[in-house]
């Protein structure tokens, strides 16, 4: 049950941060719309004073309209993701509306724990991992089954006891030699023993099967432990890689923003071409896409480590 709960919580966390990711994407689109609006104004002014061309102005307006359309699609997508999150939190049968609202707000940041170490994940892993807990429980059940089967080969001793009491009251003496009132009481006890001789072969066969099952469950446990250690190492390597990628993209976004600011100003002064400005804007758009993806991927890697550890449920 805990394994299912942990997996469900991991799915809910990842779905929630998909929404946060798309909200960050929406903010990036809105920022790019402001830059495109500035380009529209500049290209229109350049056209009016004879320094620009109408195709430049038209292309700027087309790019702005494309961003407006992208914003509308992004808002719709976020509402769809909220409905998916509601369904995972509160599953609703087909044909029924989910009672949870979809007009709630989510955070616009993705918090990431940068201090997770491999030793911290490995510490007490065999006790906290839900998958290993299941394997260990199956091994314990197999051991109890063996004890139960072995008990069938031993003699069974039973203690029996009884207390009898009877009272007879005759109003009329049918026989003069019998008393009118007769009372009997007594305590009886005894022992009985059963020796399973004829069932020996069947019991021996069941014991062998139970011993084989213990060996099989032990193999499964060791296999799951080895596989879990491998998954933890791979997940941690991914976590470290995503942290490095995030640091790189956080540095790169600053360069892209500075590049757009400088290019807009030089375009205003007539020292930069229209194509160079569009390339700078495209570089900023790509930088935002990579940064937002890096943040989300780092969070997914962190969640996976905690899922394997069993740290999502206390």
Place the predicted regions along the sequence by residue.
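Membrane-embedded beta-strand positions in outer-membrane beta-barrel channels/transporters
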Residues: 16, 122, 158, 190-192, ...
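Outer-membrane beta-barrel proteins
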Residues: 54, 168-172, 202
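Small/polar, glycine/serine/threonine/aspartate-rich low-complexity segments that form flexible
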Residues: 103-114, 147, 160-195
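Amphipathic alpha-helical coiled-coil segments
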Residues: 4, 8-27, 81, 134-149, ...
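Amphipathic alpha-helical coiled-coil scaffold segments and their short linker/junction regions
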Residues: 92-162
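Outer-membrane beta-barrel pore domains and translocons
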Residues: 63, 152, 162-166, 194-196, ...
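Transmembrane beta-barrel architecture of outer-membrane proteins
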Residues: 14, 59, 156, 186-188
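Periplasmic alpha-helical coiled-coil/stalk elements that build and connect Gram-negative outer-membrane
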Residues: 7-124, 238, 242, 284
